[in-house]
Each structure stands twice: as C-alpha cells, then as structure tokens.
C-alpha cells in the first residue's frame, strides 16, 4: 500500500513539473506568411437617371397652405379618431362649446385671415397610403364651410423680456357639434384652404411637430351633472381634448425640368428620385474577398447644400417601364443594406459596403441598381443636384482577398 502511494506521488509531481514548464514557455507562430492581399478596386463608370413620383410629404413636421417660391399647397387635411366621443353620448353631459385649433410659429399672421375650414363625414385620405396626386382634385362643394378663424398670439411674459411662443388659429365648430359627437359618425375630416387667386401662405405645425401641446386638435368644453336629483345634483365643468390622428398637406406636383445631360436631382417636395447603375457583381472581386470599405463619392457643381441627407436603397428589380413620371414609386426597395449620408462641401460620400459584400456572398442577390432619395429629415423645400459627368465621381473599394 505504501509503495502504491509513493508511486502515485511521484507521478503527480512529474505532471505538475511538466505542466508548469509548458505554461512558462510562450508559443511563437510566424503570421507573416499568411497570403492575404489588401487591394483597391476603383470604379468610375457610374450612370443614372431621374424619375418622378407623387411627392411623399406625409410625416413632415409642418403643414402648408398657399404658395411659397415655386411650390403651391392646395390644402391641408386632417382626420380625427372615431373612438374618442363616447363621453358626450350621455344624457348627463351637455356640450357648451367646441373648437378646432391649429398652431403656427409665424407671429405675423393677421386677424381674420382668409384661411377657410371645411368639414366632411367622408373618408378622404389615409396619411400612410394616399397619394398626393389623388388628393389634388378633392371638390369642396359638398363640404360644410365653417369659415375663417380667430387669431391669438401667445406671448410669454414670465420674464422681464416678453417672448413670442406661438400663434393660435381657432374655429368655432359649434354648428357641427351634433354630427361630430355622434358615435355613428365614422369619419371626421377637416380641410384648410385658401380662396382661388389668393397669394397668402400659411405654415402650421403638424402632429409630428410636438408631443401633443401644439398638435392640431378639437377642444370640447362641457358640463356633467352628478346625482339623480336635479335640485341637489352637482355640475362639473370639464374640458376634453381630441388630438388629430392624421394630417397631410396637398401639393401641386412640379414636373422636373430638363436637368442637363447626365445630372440627377433629388427633392422631396418635387418627388424627384434617381436610379444609379454601378457595374459591380459577384465576379468583380476575387472569390472569398472581404470588403473593408466601399464608398461612393458624387460631386456637384456650384454651391454645396451642406447637411442635405440622401438615402440609398438597393433595388429588388427594375420595372419594365419606359416612363419617368409615376403616381406611386414602381422601384421596389430590397428592404436591406440601405444607408444614408449628408452632403458636405459639394460632395456626397455614402457607404455601399454592406450591400456589395452581400452581393459577393449571396448567389441569389444581383445588383440591379441603387435608388437615391431625399431623407425625411430634410427641409421639404430643399433639393440637391449631382453631376454624373464630374471627373471626381468614383466608387472606391478596399478589400482583402485570400
């Protein structure tokens, strides 16, 4: 038994010595012979063309009515929800007054502006799906004309210096109260528009502008009787605010002028977008290459519009159409690998790395073209123009190949 323990102890000691000796000696490998080549692919054969759709201006933080520069806004439309009116369908409730309100950052709006409010119980538009081109021909003959608003300029006097806050445009819609609070009314649609020939212009806050305080709204002032005995019942005076659920401005579409040879214009208010063709496919780089960067640089002549944001979407397919003017956009996005960048110093530099790496790796993915459009964060009236003949335009790809 003792000899067995002695033998076990000697073996264990040898194991510890061997392990400690191994752990103290670092392992060296020569990595200098790995056969990776860092290289560059430069593509300058970049072509493209413009196309135009019905302007997509939904979701913008402002609403417009009237003419500004070359743009004309025929109206602004408002939808209110159908599920906020049960409170008033109660025998104990009496509506005292009801108002439609919109807000503006313009302190110079005069009293009695010629901005007319109309009301309809029809479903006129859907902010997400309606095309502006389909809303231009809305006839107001069968709408109820509510009239013009009262105007109140709100000034903050809490400090020693008075500060302008906002302008409130308010319409008394008491004549519509029975229809509006009726739970059988499915749609409550309003429109703001100017008389024909008016040169006025109004800029209002949309529901996207704030978290609620400056949203278009309906304010209802009402009383509720508490208690069954008329002689001893208590009357509560209350206010209910119903915020707009959808709003959109209707703009007249401006056709794109001849933009010059091989120039592309990107503009949200014009509905102007562009398709770019870049000769890149799965055979453009050696097999199993890894792209480190792939930056497309486009230049423009003249003054730069800094901070204009451009979005790139790879296309799923090219539509079979010889037209360049459409209502809806026929160029369907792939839905993946999109990117965006801002113009700076006459130059747009935007990454295509994610998309082109996938083109290399995915057999079923083919580069059929790239869509360029204005990001929704841009000022609605701004646009950017790129010269596809510019000598500095290029796609520069840095890659590693085995």
Go through each PLM region and give its residues:
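Secreted, disulfide-rich extracellular signaling modules
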Residues: 2-6, 12, 19-402
């Amino acid at each position: 038994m003792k000899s067995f323990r002695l033998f076990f102890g000697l073996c264990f000691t040898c194991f510890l010595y061997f392990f400690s000796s191994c752990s103290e000696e670092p392992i060296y490998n020569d990595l200098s012979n790995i056969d990776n080549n860092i290289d560059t692919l430069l593509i300058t054969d970049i072509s493209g063309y413009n196309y135009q759709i019905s302007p997509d201006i939904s979701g913008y933080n402002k609403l417009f009515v009237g003419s500004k520069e070359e743009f004309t806004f025929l109206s602004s439309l408002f939808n209110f929800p159908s599920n906020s009116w049960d409170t008033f369908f109660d025998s104990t409730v009496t509506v005292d007054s009801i108002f439609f309100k919109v807000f503006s950052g313009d302190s110079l709006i005069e009293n009695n502006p010629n901005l007319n409010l109309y009301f309809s119980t029809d479903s006129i538009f859907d902010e997400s799906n309606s095309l502006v081109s389909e809303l231009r021909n809305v006839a107001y003959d069968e709408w109820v004309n509510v009239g013009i608003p009262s105007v109140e300029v709100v000034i903050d006097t809490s400090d020693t210096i008075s500060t302008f806050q906002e302008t409130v445009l308010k319409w008394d819609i008491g004549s519509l109260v029975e229809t509006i609070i009726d739970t059988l009314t499915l749609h409550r649609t309003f429109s703001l528009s100017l008389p024909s020939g008016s040169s006025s212009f109004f800029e209002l806050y949309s529901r996207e502008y704030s978290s609620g305080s400056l949203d278009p709204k309906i304010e209802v002032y009402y009383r509720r009787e508490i208690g069954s005995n008329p002689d001893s019942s208590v009357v509560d005076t209350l206010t209910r605010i119903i915020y707009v659920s959808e709003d959109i401005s209707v703009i007249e579409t401006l056709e794109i002028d001849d933009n010059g040879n091989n120039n592309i214009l990107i503009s949200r208010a014009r509905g102007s977008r562009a398709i770019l063709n870049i000769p890149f496919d799965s055979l453009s780089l050696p097999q199993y290459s890894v792209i480190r960067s792939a930056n497309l640089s486009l230049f423009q002549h003249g003054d730069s519009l800094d901070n204009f944001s451009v979005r790139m979407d790879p296309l799923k397919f090219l539509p079979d159409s010889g037209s360049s003017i459409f209502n809806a956009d026929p160029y369907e996005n792939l839905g993946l690998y999109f990117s965006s960048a801002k113009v700076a110093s006459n130059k747009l530099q935007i990454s295509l790395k994610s998309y082109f790496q996938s083109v290399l790796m995915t057999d079923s993915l083919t580069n059929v073209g790239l869509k360029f459009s204005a990001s929704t964060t841009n000022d609605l009236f701004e646009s950017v123009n790129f010269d596809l003949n510019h000598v500095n335009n290029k796609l520069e790809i840095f890659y590693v190949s085995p």
